[in-house]
Amino acid sequence: MNLPTVLCIIALILGVRSAKNGFFTKLGKPIVCDDINFVGNYCQTKCVKAGANNGFCCQQKCYCLGLNDYAPTLQVADSSEKACQAMSG
């Protein structure tokens, strides 16, 4: 067998997991964070519960980091997405 074939087989066995960032949605609506829960770990808790690695409040919505590819996310303008990605470090 050649090397690419072996690498593909190993990847399938290990189960390659991809991650994405975005505003997680539940029933088509984003998780809202307002002035009361902007500070603290409200969004982190909500995002981790949704399967993400982390999360924070950005533009009054919870922005999740490390969601799986199949997690539903809100479609937003590129400028909004870039602003939240910049805040994530």
From Swiss-Prot:
Location of this chain's protein in the cell: Secreted
Protein name: Neurotoxin LmNaTx28
Covalent S-S links between cysteines: C33-C57, C43-C62, C47-C64, C58-C84
GO terms for cellular component: extracellular region
Organism: Lychas mucronatus
Functional description taken from the UniProt entry: Binds voltage-independently at site-4 of sodium channels (Nav) and shift the voltage of activation toward more negative potentials thereby affecting sodium channel activation and promoting spontaneous and repetitive firing.
Keyword Flavoprotein: no
Protein family according to the UniProt entry: Belongs to the long (4 C-C) scorpion toxin superfamily. Sodium channel inhibitor family. Beta subfamily.
Main location per the UniProt record: secreted
Domain of life: Eukaryota
Note on domains (UniProt): Has the structural arrangement of an alpha-helix connected to antiparallel beta-sheets by disulfide bonds (CS-alpha/beta).
Signal peptide: 1-18
Tissues expressing the protein: Expressed by the venom gland.
Lineage: Eukaryota, Metazoa, Ecdysozoa, Arthropoda, Chelicerata
Span of domain LCN-type CS-alpha/beta: 20-85
GO MF assignments: ion channel inhibitor activity; sodium channel regulator activity; toxin activity
Transmembrane segments: none
The entry's keywords: Disulfide bond, Ion channel impairing toxin, Neurotoxin, Secreted, Signal, Toxin, Voltage-gated sodium channel impairing toxin
